[in-house]
């Protein structure tokens, strides 16, 4: 049996004065999956997340949880439906280099890893895929 849809956002539109933050965005997350919303600053990631968690109301579109349409008027509504969000704060974690960020989630990484080897591997991958990445840049 296939995975069931846990979250489905269809045709989500959210506008702010002078800005269309989300323009008919669709997102479907299956039960048991983990997703990451990636994009440049201003791409609408936080706005979409804020709609899902009840901080904002969408101007158009629908949100479904487990196949049932929901309308959140507040974060409390979303929490009651099992949806919550831990907000990122820019000072929660110190800045790391590109190389340190790449290995951050590795189970065998530690403070004692070979920083030069990690930076060299990141540079190698950057070169292979034509990316202009400086492994020592702090981000």
Protein language model features and the residues they cover:
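Glycine-rich phosphate-binding loops of nucleotide-dependent enzymes
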Residues: 1-139
């Amino acid at each position: 049996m296939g995975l069931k849809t846990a979250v489905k956002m269809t045709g989500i539109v959210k506008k702010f004065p002078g800005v269309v933050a989300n323009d008919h965005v669709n997102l479907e997350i299956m039960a048991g999956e983990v997703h990451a919303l990636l994009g440049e600053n201003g791409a609408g990631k936080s706005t979409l997340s804020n709609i899902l968690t009840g901080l904002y109301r969408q101007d158009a579109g629908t949100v479904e949880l487990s196949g049932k349409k929901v309308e959140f008027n507040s974060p409390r509504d979303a929490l009651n439906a099992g949806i919550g969000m831990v907000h990122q704060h820019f000072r929660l974690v110190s800045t790391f280099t590109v190389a340190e960020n790449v290995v951050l989630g590795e189970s065998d990484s530690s403070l004692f890893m070979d920083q030069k080897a990690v930076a060299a591997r990141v540079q190698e991958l950057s070169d292979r895929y034509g990316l202009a990445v400086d492994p020592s840049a702090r981000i």
